[in-house]
């Protein structure tokens, strides 16, 4: 793109005025799915506009996957530094958890600067692909136009042949609990300026588990309040049990079968008192973090054009991402199918392939089956396909065979028992050919290991296919191709 064209594009963005501008494709939401779809559409020559309310990259870049993983790295490194003595390293240094120092404010500055750089990269990539973008809050008018209210309260109006709603989600707050607003959401976790000495995380899902693990690894007195007996209840039993037991062993205070009933604040100290329905109180708390779920981010005037929502207020779409209104589409967290960044990216690209690409893509759609997912807990956990329970429900107990292995990875061979974390693998197979319909792993590097095995399961691999692969020794992953 020439300098003149670049300048012209900047001028267009600055002077999109009161006149109504028309596009081939208008995308509401600058998260992973929206950005991917807009860039792919523009690559086919579609005149494309992307509207984002806050910062490019959406939840993943700004309040989710990316800053979370950076925090996880810090916490994981803190834990591993403590293992050095087992390998006779730094024997003259006190590398215990009690002696750990972590400069949270300085680390936050570096992390936030990294995220800001990513925001800029997103903007530059959009410009490179020829996508126009504006910042502001989008809403539909009754005649199907899209109005954007910008930060300066100016309003711009657009029309388009095709419109994608990819606005993502937002955290849920327990508004009925007295004092709930003394706590913050998982989004606001990244805004904490100082490390809390004592923290309570509420919620058994992967977000709560990851945040509690980060705090514990960095030396905070970490409490996790869950309604059931185990964390990660949407995962296979082996993951639920292993992560729960390991967290307890590593010092996370898990309050099982508990619900928060009231939150009080001592105005003189700023400390919180968390009351549970078990009669127990957690006092002298510095920070309370709610991770009890997320809901679709709407407020777009979808009712003005008749877009149908389900009982959870998620946009109803068919297998091709079509909403109930012609030429209006939706994907990502706002539809609630598989709420993962790579899924939104893949769905966004395939939608644009279908709408603007060559004939070979006219029936392309996203496959939501066998999507690998991981939890950056301590240790990591990963899963693809059916859990053992789901497989039995679907195929019958007599048609399901399960292979299990539990061991200590070689990394821990030099350590005392108290410092070891378990590795546990499970294959769920069905039918005479023993097709692998589920794989569940817990242990170091599970996220990296799962990616390759995810390809195998997506291709329909059988237990015999796994067995035919020569193991890489010595590794933990070799266990998956030697299970008996």
From Swiss-Prot:
Active-site feature positions: 473
SUPFAM superfamilies assigned: FAD/NAD(P)-binding domain, FAD/NAD-linked reductases, dimerisation (C-terminal) domain
Reactions that this protein is recorded to catalyse: 2 glutathione + NADP(+) = glutathione disulfide + NADPH + H(+)
Keywords, sorted A to Z: Cytoplasm, Disulfide bond, FAD, Flavoprotein, Mitochondrion, NADP, Oxidoreductase, Redox-active center
Species this protein is from: Kluyveromyces lactis (strain ATCC 8585 / CBS 2359 / DSM 70799 / NBRC 1267 / NRRL Y-1140 / WM37)
InterPro entries from the UniProt entry: FAD/NAD-bd_sf, FAD/NAD-binding_dom, FAD/NAD-linked_Rdtase_dimer_sf, Glutathione_Rdtase_euk/bac, GSHR/TRXR-like, Pyr_nuc-diS_OxRdtase, Pyr_nucl-diS_OxRdtase_dimer, Pyr_OxRdtase_I_AS
UniProt cofactor(s): FAD
Gene Ontology molecular functions: flavin adenine dinucleotide binding; glutathione-disulfide reductase (NADPH) activity; NADP binding
GO cellular component, one term: cytosol
Enzyme Commission number, as recorded: 1.8.1.7
Function: Catalyzes the reduction of glutathione disulfide (GSSG) to reduced glutathione (GSH). Constitutes the major mechanism to maintain a high GSH:GSSG ratio in the cytosol.
Disulfide cross-links: 60-65
Binding site residues for FAD: 32-33, 52, 59-60, 68, 138, 333, 341, 473
Residue positions binding NADP(+): 204, 207, 210, 227, 233, 293, 339, 374
Main localization, broad class: cytoplasm
Top-tier EC class: oxidoreductase
Remarks, miscellaneous: The active site is a redox-active disulfide bond.
Gene for this chain: GLR1
Stated name of the protein: Glutathione reductase
Location within or outside the cell: Cytoplasm; Mitochondrion
């Amino acid at each position: 793109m020439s300098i003149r064209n670049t300048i012209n594009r900047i001028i267009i963005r600055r002077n999109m005025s009161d006149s109504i501008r028309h596009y081939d494709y208008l995308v509401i939401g600058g998260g992973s799915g929206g950005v991917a779809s807009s860039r792919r559409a523009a690559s086919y020559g579609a005149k494309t506009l992307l509207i984002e309310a806050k910062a490019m990259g959406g939840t993943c870049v700004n309040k989710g996957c990316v800053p979370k993983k950076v925090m996880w790295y810090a916490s994981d490194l803190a834990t591993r530094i403590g293992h050095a003595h087992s390998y006779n390293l730094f024997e003259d240094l006190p590398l215990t958890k009690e002696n750990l120092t972590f400069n949270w404010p300085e680390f936050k500055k570096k992390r936030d600067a990294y995220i800001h750089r990513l925001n800029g990269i997103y903007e530059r990539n959009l410009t490179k692909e020829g996508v126009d973008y504006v910042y502001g809050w989008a809403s539909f008018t009754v005649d199907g136009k899209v109005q954007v209210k910008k930060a300066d309260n100016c309003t711009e109006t657009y029309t388009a042949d095709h419109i994608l709603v990819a606005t993502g989600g937002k955290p849920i707050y327990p508004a009925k609990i007295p004092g709930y607003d003394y706590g913050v959401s998982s989004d606001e976790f990244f805004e904490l300026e100082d490390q809390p000495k004592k923290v309570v995380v509420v919620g058994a899902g992967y977000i709560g588990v990851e945040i509690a693990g980060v705090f514990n690894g960095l030396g905070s007195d970490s409490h996790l309040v869950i309604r059931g007996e185990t964390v990660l209840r949407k995962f296979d039993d082996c993951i639920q049990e292993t992560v729960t037991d390991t967290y307890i062993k590593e010092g996370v205070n898990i309050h099982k079968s508990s619900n928060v009933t009231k939150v009080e604040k001592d105005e003189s100290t700023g400390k919180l008192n968390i009351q549970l329905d078990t009669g127990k109180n957690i006092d002298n708390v510095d920070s309370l973090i709610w991770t009890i779920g997320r809901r679709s981010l709407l407020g777009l005037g979808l009712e003005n054009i008749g877009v149908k929502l389900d009982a959870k207020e998620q946009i109803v779409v068919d297998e091709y991402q079509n909403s109930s209104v012609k030429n209006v589409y939706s994907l990502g967290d706002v539809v609630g199918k598989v709420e993962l960044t790579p899924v939104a990216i893949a769905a966004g690209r395939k939608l644009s392939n279908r709408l603007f690409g060559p004939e070979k893509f006219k029936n392309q759609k996203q496959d939501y089956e066998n999507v690998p997912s991981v939890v950056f807990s301590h240790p990591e956990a990963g899963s693809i396909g059916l859990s053992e329970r789901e497989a039995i429900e679907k195929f019958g107990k007599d048609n399901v065979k399960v292979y299990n292995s539990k061991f200590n990875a070689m990394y821990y061979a030099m350590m005392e028992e108290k410092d070891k974390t378990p590795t546990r693998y499970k294959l769920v197979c069905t039918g005479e050919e023993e097709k692998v319909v589920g794989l569940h792993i817990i242990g170091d590097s599970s996220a990296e290991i799962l990616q390759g095995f995810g390809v195998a399961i997506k291709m329909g691999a059988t237990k015999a296919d796994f067995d035919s692969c020569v193991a890489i020794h010595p590794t933990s992953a070799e266990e998956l191709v030697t299970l008996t």
